Amino acid sequence: MLKRNPISNNFIYFFGALGGLLFGYDTGVISGAMLFIGKELEIQTGSFEDGFITASVLLGAILGAAIIGPMSDKLGRKKLLLSAAIIFFVGALGSGIGFNYTLLVTSRVLLGIAVGAASALIPTYLAELSPADKRGGIGTLFQLMIMTGIFLAYVSNEWLSPSGWLGLNQNVGWHWMLGLAAVPAALLFIGG
């Protein structure tokens, strides 16, 4: 349990839970981006490649959660959370650049590894940092941030689509949709 003032504790809880926001954003944003990715990369809707772009995050998440659990007791949750933030950042940038199928899938697998790591690390990390009488509320912060991330993904999908608020070209908007996740990833690293 932390022995700092409440502002410092809240700061740590918020930044720790940013991994949940990234989890939600990275799993939700693909629904809007796929409408335009297929056109630019010439991938047929409903094809194996189309489905694999979406599923690659989940495959990475399985790997990330399986690997990070045993490592967290040896290396510490904070170090691994910072490592996950770096992986989130690299994966988001790679997805945003995504000029070909291989780069996009590889970047999304990296994002999945970070999602799996965050899922295994953050709830325990927040529980260890919080006082017993506030542990339940602070523990739900991770889940709240996942839902907030999904909501923000749908907002960005709307705003960055050709018919959306910013009206970006379909070959530009999806890159921004996926790449924007680098911002909270950088904040997670800085705040961690």
Which residues are covered by each model-predicted region?
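Transmembrane-helix signature of 12-pass secondary carriers
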Residues: 1-192
